[in-house]
Amino acid sequence: MDENNGLLLLELNPPNPWDLQPRSPEELAFGEVQITYLTHACMDLKLGDKRMVFDPWLIGPAFARGWWLLHEPPSDWLERLCQADLIYISHLHSDHLSYPTLKKLAGRRPDIPIYVGNTERPVFWNLNQSGVQLTNINVVPFGIWQQVDKNLRFMILMDGVHPEMDTCIIVEYKGHKILNIVDCTRPNGGRLPMKVALMMSDFAGGASGFPMTFSGGKFTEEWKAQFIKTERKKLLNYKARLVKNLQPRIYCPFAGYFVESHPSDKYIKETNTKNDPNELNNLIKKNSDVITWTPRPGATLDLGRMLKDRTDSKGIIEPPEGTKIYKDSWDFEPYLEILNAALGDEIFLHSSWIKEYFTWAGFKDYNLVVRMIETDEDFNPFPGGYDYLVDFLDLSFPKERPQREHPYEEIHSRVDVIRHVVKNGLLWDELYIGFQTRLQRDPDIYHHLFWNHFQIKLPLTPPNWKSFLMCCEQNGPVILQFSTERTNEPNRNKFSVENKA
């Protein structure tokens, strides 16, 4: 209120946090700042006498068993990680937070400093469950410079669309800024530093089960193909506009180099087309004079050289002739064995695990009925597997769909993955982004509250299965797993083969 008891409106226009304590760029010596691409979203930065690594995913799958590395990492990747002075991990998705990779690193350097943003869902929420022994994880506030030495500092910023989990980073060395927006949909709400020395971002698309894993209604192969084509083009145009607006000296498309290489995901691999980084680079060059760099594993960009003379032949050093660029084999078995270990777990001998799990999950008071069906590799019902309904309005488990009007979804999940997720209390991104489900829904509506809960808001500790099994022992003999037979599908809200509006 003002002095006349009137309402006083103030428009807040705070300064950009990276403009606080500004530092003028100093000339860089050749070789002083070098950025080496390892694979996917992993970069190895030499910054004077310090080394910093982004998002190390170098071995194993991401999202259960759905994503595998497209590029062959340099053979010295583990040495590079061990020599790092600090590591930045942008968010909790397993193509950025790779526990198989970190397990290798922790075996050599458990105390390596790792920095993450102070997100609502902690990046390392599942560290204890993972069994990885890391002892120097640092959670830092957003928008505040973190000083590494007199020449090097960094600042972590949140995403404007997914602030609960996504972050990006500004690294500054002797006044030269490197902006890595990673997977952020709207990094820092759209406010970002302009004319940085180097900017890098994702570009590929395809990091979702939609629409490839959907069927029924409008989800014909023709509709999916057109949707994917349109969405990929929209993403390319958005990235090109962002680069044009921010005017970095150099732009690098990365964080999109994955492939659905397991034979069981052949359909996804063929359907889920991704953007070509060179197409994005050509689009950028049409509208600006920004230098673009499409990296190959082991390629190194010398920032000092490139800023001084963009035509310098030594500005970008490609890997030696004959270096293997693309992976042609993946070690599937050790990771599939981990998933398969959940199949015969004692938990699933008791049908009451269903109520135990969904009560633990804590999602209810929402008018949605979901049918969960365990399947084999090819999404056919798994022999002896579970097939059940969950009514989230009152969190009940009826044998038939309720008579009231209700949205309905069917989620077919590969049995090894869904049981691994249930047993360990993991987020459903393992299923959805990992292409481990097939879905139908009626009506064709995205239930944000449901999916957001299971993808980001599940409890931070897994279900107490030890206590559950003790109760089962006290309450009587084992109830063998069952399959709910539904030979006559209910007519209510039955899926139509016609397209839905």
Curated annotation (Swiss-Prot):
Alphabetic keyword roster: Cytoplasm
Kindly state the tissue distribution recorded for this protein: Widely expressed. Highly expressed in thymus. Not expressed in brain. May be expressed in adult stem cells (at protein level).
Location(s), subcellular: Cytoplasm
Q: Output the Pfam families linked to this UniProt entry.
A: Lactamase_B_3
InterPro entries linked to this entry: Cnh (IPR027033), RibonucZ/Hydroxyglut_hydro (IPR036866)
Which Gene Ontology CC terms are recorded?
cytoplasm; cytoskeleton; membrane; nucleus
The GO biological-process annotations, alphabetized, read as: CMP-N-acetylneuraminate metabolic process; regulation of Wnt signaling pathway
Any GO molecular function? CMP-N-acetylneuraminate monooxygenase activity
Which family is it part of? Belongs to the CMP-Neu5Ac hydroxylase family.
- Biological role: Sialic acids are components of carbohydrate chains of glycoconjugates and are involved in cell-cell recognition and cell-pathogen interactions. That protein has no CMP-N-acetylneuraminate monooxygenase activity and is not able to convert CMP-N-acetylneuraminic acid (CMP-Neu5Ac) into its hydroxylated derivative CMP-N-glycolylneuraminic acid (CMP-Neu5Gc), a sialic acid abundantly expressed at the surface of many cells in vertebrates. However, it may play a role in Wnt signaling.
Q: What is this protein called?
A: Inactive cytidine monophosphate-N-acetylneuraminic acid hydroxylase
Species of the source = Homo sapiens (Human)
Identify the coding gene.
CMAHP
